[in-house]
């Protein structure tokens, strides 16, 4: 991210603060922090806090041992680094930074959604008259719309995870434990260009009916349906895709169930276009599954936003009447889960464009037989 890019984001945050009559944004290490500064220090017991003021006087309070890293990354961005020693109270530096920026004790402050509770409680004790809200009311609307560089990063992440999906038949074979398949997937995800693996869900047979199953000791058997949900991070941006395979002959009725799911997922992707609500995309998938008699077995929302985080705004769920806009990126991932038997899910990342929806995953969604 260029210095101009970061400076532009800081200006947009300041404008959002002013619009919401909020004096400052306070962020610890988080996706919001990374979105603004282009790097993220470790979120440890030592306080790191970025103070972005609506007045334009920004500070970064950091432990002294991490100050060189902060200075290197900030460059000439104009953020003042306040390094604190082990014997100092960093909250006092935060309060001082707010005062220097003109924020009084009764300020309205937007605090990072993922800030450690211990830091927030200490800040509230130091500024009991301040009014507090969450950072997402400020940063959420800004991060929700991806710029072209972000979309390009998501596309690279999608291509990298697709390269792993193309090889699933190498690992999903009878006689292998789920956890061993997950370990191979972790290696393959990194080898495909991800700097880290975010998750490797391998749910075989009845375990596939648990959407967030943790890969365990169960051995994959002939006739199993196997749900594979994998993702990582490329250039800071996340990939996330799900495919369902069958080992040999599909279980009774599974091919018909899967075809319902495939039709529903395609309908959800086709429904994406500017002005359509998130709830409408959910309904496009859910109505087909419900009409086929599987409605009670579709037990989660249709999708979630994606970017610097695996799950972020917008959420594709009933009741979310927010209209889609070009630049929004999210998953479309309906699933059908029959407890004690098997599950199935298909997931693609979709970007809303001026003309409709662009899928960032291109691997086949046909029922794939392996083993």
Per-region residue spans from a language model:
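Active-site neighborhoods and metal-handling regions in enzymes and metal-associated proteins
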Residues: 1-371
């Amino acid at each position: 991210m260029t210095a101009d890019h970061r400076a532009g984001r800081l200006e947009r945050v300041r404008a959002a603060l002013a619009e919401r009559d909020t004096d400052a944004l306070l962020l610890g290490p988080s996706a919001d922090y990374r979105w603004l500064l282009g790097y993220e220090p470790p979120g440890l017991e030592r306080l790191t806090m970025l103070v972005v003021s609506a007045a334009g006087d920004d500070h970064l309070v950091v432990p002294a041992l991490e100050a060189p890293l902060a200075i290197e990354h900030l460059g000439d961005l104009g953020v003042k680094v306040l390094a604190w020693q082990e014997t100092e109270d960093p909250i006092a530096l935060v309060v001082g930074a707010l005062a220097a920026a003109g924020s009084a004790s009764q300020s309205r402050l937007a605090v990072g959604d993922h800030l450690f509770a211990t830091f927030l409680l200490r800040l509230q004790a130091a500024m009991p008259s301040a009014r507090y809200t969450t950072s997402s009311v400020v940063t959420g609307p800004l991060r929700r719309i991806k710029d072209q560089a972000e979309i390009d990063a998501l596309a690279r992440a999608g291509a990298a995870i697709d390269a792993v999906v193309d090889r699933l038949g190498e690992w999903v074979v009878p006689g292998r434990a789920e956890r061993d398949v997950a370990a191979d997937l972790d290696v393959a995800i990194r080898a495909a260009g991800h700097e880290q693996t975010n998750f490797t869900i391998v749910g075989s047979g009845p375990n596939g009916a648990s959407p967030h199953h943790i890969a365990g000791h169960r051995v994959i058997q002939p006739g199993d349906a196997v749900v594979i949900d994998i993702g990582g991070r490329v250039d800071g941006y996340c990939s996330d895709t799900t495919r369902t395979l069958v080992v040999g002959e599909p279980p009774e009725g599974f091919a018909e169930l899967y075809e319902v799911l495939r039709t529903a997922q395609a309908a959800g992707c086709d429904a994406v276009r500017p002005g359509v609500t998130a709830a409408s995309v959910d309904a496009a998938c859910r109505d087909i599954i419900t009409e086929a008699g599987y409605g009670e077995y579709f037990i989660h929302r249709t999708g979630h936003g994606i970017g610097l985080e695996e799950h972020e705004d917008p959420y594709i769920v009933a009741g979310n009447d927010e209209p889609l806009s070009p630049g929004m990126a999210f998953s479309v991932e309906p699933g059908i889960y029959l407890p004690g038997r098997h599950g199935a899910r298909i997931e693609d990342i979709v970007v809303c464009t001026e003309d409709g929806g662009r899928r960032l995953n291109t691997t086949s969604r046909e029922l794939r037989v392996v083993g």
